[in-house]
Amino acid sequence: MFWIVLIVILLLALAGLFFVRAQSEREWMREVSAWQEKKGEKQAELPEIKDGMPDFPELALMLFHAVKTAVYWLFVGVVRFCRNYLAHESEPDRPVPPASANRADVPTASDGYSDSGNGTEEAETEEAEAAEEEAADTEDIATAVIDNRRIPFDRSIAEGLMPSESEISPVRPVFKEITLEEATRALNSAALRETKKRYIDAFEKNETAVPKVRVSDTPMEGLQIIGLDDPVLQRTYSHMFDADKEAFSESADYGFEPYFEKQHPSAFSAVKAENARNAPFHRHAGQGKGQAEAKSPDVSQGQSVSDGTAVRDARRRVSVNLKEPNKATVSAEARISRLIPESQTVVGKRDVEMPSETENVFTETVSSVGYGGPVYDETADIHIEEPAAPDAWVVEPPEVPKVPMTAIDIQPPPPVSEIYNRTYEPPSGFEQVQRSRIAETDHLADDVLNGGWQEETAAIADDGSEGAAERSSGQYLSETEAFGHDSQAVCPFENVPSERPSCRVSDTEADEGAFPSEETGAVSEHLPTTDLLLPPLFNPEATQTEEELLENSITIEEKLAEFKVKVKVVDSYSGPVITRYEIEPDVGVRGNSVLNLEKDLARSLGVASIRVVETIPGKTCMGLELPNPKRQMIRLSEIFNSPEFAESKSKLTLALGQDITGQPVVTDLGKAPHLLVAGTTGSGKSVGVNAMILSMLFKAAPEDVRMIMIDPKMLELSIYEGIPHLLAPVVTDMKLAANALNWCVNEMEKRYRLMSFMGVRNLAGFNQKIAEAAARGEKIGNPFSLTPDDPEPLEKLPFIVVVVDEFADLMMTAGKKIEELIARLAQKARAAGIHLILATQRPSVDVITGLIKANIPTRIAFQVSSKIDSRTILDQMGAENLLGQGDMLFLLPGTAYPQRVHGAFASDEEVHRVVEYLKQFGEPDYVDDILSGGGSEELPGIGRSGDDETDPMYDEAVSVVLKTRKASISGVQRALRIGYNRAARLIDQMEAEGIVSAPEHNGNRTILVPLDNA
């Protein structure tokens, strides 16, 4: 019946499979015919069909594989079942073969080890057959157990369960060597597995935990209660107490000694102040050494322990005495002798009354465990006799009577009129001498010499205030406010370190006839103040908080990580315009990788530009300079009020602005010694030059610093026209500018000759020599005077600063000659006190040549348009990433790392105020030769400027021209046998000397020297 059902199932499965296949083929043919009708194509154009139809659909394939798998496993199961069933039915009483017979053909372990190389295939075959036989036997036994059939006991079966000879072979197995840590870990793992298995078995068997038995507090009924008076208990207690008496006394001593020390302080010796101060330190140090050492009385008193055994014995004696309740009074001396060593001295002997037996605080009780000992009773009262009153009392000193202060009679100061009425009448002829030496433009000195100061001081005395009078000439300050006075000499020029003599001296000096010979300038102390400038301006919204800096630091790290550049922001500095973040690249990250991401990082952070500082001097990190969302306005008054500018003693101090942290930046032009400023239009170049000029005007008087200004644009520097610091009017014509530079070269040569004669190395040494001679009342004559018999005296030489606003226009006008003059001044003019400030908006190589750059090491670069311009100015990149509006890079001489500075803003209103303030103190003293150029009409600076050496054949050429009466280049060339260029220069020199005229329209020249003079 079973076989019939199985066959029917197989047939149905096959029929279903064929039905699905036929159905799929029918559907496929229907789709093909529909496709043919739609496309209208021929049968030949259809794709080829394999086996009449395409592949099965997915559902058919899945069904086919499922049926195939089911049929396979069903067939395997039926075959196994039939085999087992037929085997048991055919041989129900088949005896189990002996195990020894089955193992006879199986090779042992020793056989395998001995003959491992021979007969490998035979051994494998025998092992396979033996394994099949054992499997069959085991299966028979298992089948018998399942069928509940008893198997008769057979010794062969028992022998089969015993270990074989190969298993108890003397051959040692090969063990794996492991470490102790691995073995411990394996044992722990095995223990955990065993515990887990035990708990799992208990859970599967539904084992319940044994309930805990609650112990009753009351004894069971019928038991005998043993009290404290039981003889056995008392005997046991006595033996235990005697055995532990020594240990207990020592432990009790440790517990009661602090109480004894606290309640009976008079029982100890006197404690020194030093020991009392050291006691807390000893107690703190003793906490880690045990309770006994920390609580000992000698440590409490700040004393060192020298003999530990003696102290321990003393403790034991004290503990024994404390347990004797019959003693009511204990001698203090005896107790102290037991507590401290014999070497200690005892100060004071008084008896301390101990409490009685009923009030004994050390009561003996028996504990619940049968151990007794003294226990401290907190409820007991303690009575200690008060110490005796001291023999001497501290007596306060008697009160000091108050002594009334004696009245001091101070004479009132004399009235102002008495001070100002002390006048001095100069000797005869003094006024004429002074008038000849003082310039006519010095109105202040004229007023003083004419006696105008007496009228003003009298008006001040009548009014009663020093600042009440004003000059009738319209000056801002009065005489007394500008110059000051004292009780010994009243002179408006008293504190003025200048070259001109003071107009009034004290009476003593007048009697002695001590008149300073050095001239003093009246305007030396008329320096402008910061009141003329706009006050500082601070915008609190432009400051960045710590949270914003931290957020930007995290953003920088994340954005650089996106470009596979790992860095860490270590610090940040927030300034008025930018914020610098110092980053430390990770190990293996090059600095160029951060530099190449400059524009990408700026775009990612949403800022206009980022400047990457590859090297920060003194640090091991790089720098990222990001612009602030809002920038601060830096006023010029903020820099002038700073200590850096105020404490600078140089007359050529330049205020540049603030650095990235907001600190003022000032420099000394005398140490520069020349300055090159370059930047595009609108970068703040002209404003920076104005700030530098105002810095020198605020620091130096006209007798200290003189200026020559060249302004091709006629707008920037023309505002300074008329200030007393100018040597010449502001030059706006470039042809005259070359003359000014030529005069500077001649002045430089003149000063070098004077310094060589004086034996000094710079201008400061020369001026010091002049000042020392004037202090001695001597005068130094000019060694190069045109009148050697009566030479004019040498005077103090001021610094000369040449400011050129647009250097490129000057280079285009004069060209090569201007470059030579600038190079000569840059090379040699430093020691002569002549300094250059060159500014240009076209930083190209034809303007800033290599010769100029080599001699001007100090440079300032404002914002430029390209990296090439930045390299032209600074010899490195970075200026193209500046922000404009005064943002600059300042390169100091001798350094390769420029400093970023934010320039101070000088408005036109501030410049006008300072100029008007300076104009009121006098007209400038111009030098006419600066712009005239000696009256020559040719290109200034090109004719004879600098040609101090005359051609040795010049006289012969003049003689030839005068004899022949022909001024031709070819005639001079033939007569002197020289080249054309040299002959042409000689003719040009004759024209400059006025010997021949300029060439006419036909090229002929007329000899201007008469024949008689020839």
Swiss-Prot record:
Residue ranges with Acidic residues bias: 121-140
Compartments (UniProt record): Cell inner membrane
Residues that span the membrane, as ranges: 1-21
Major subcellular site: membrane
Entry-linked InterPro entries: FtsK/SpoIIIE/SftA (IPR050206), FtsK_alpha (IPR041027), FtsK_dom (IPR002543), Ftsk_gamma (IPR018541), P-loop_NTPase (IPR027417), WH-like_DNA-bd_sf (IPR036388), WH_DNA-bd_sf (IPR036390)
Family (UniProt): Belongs to the FtsK/SpoIIIE/SftA family.
Name assigned to this protein: DNA translocase FtsK 2
Species annotation: Neisseria meningitidis serogroup B (strain ATCC BAA-335 / MC58)
Annotated gene: ftsK2
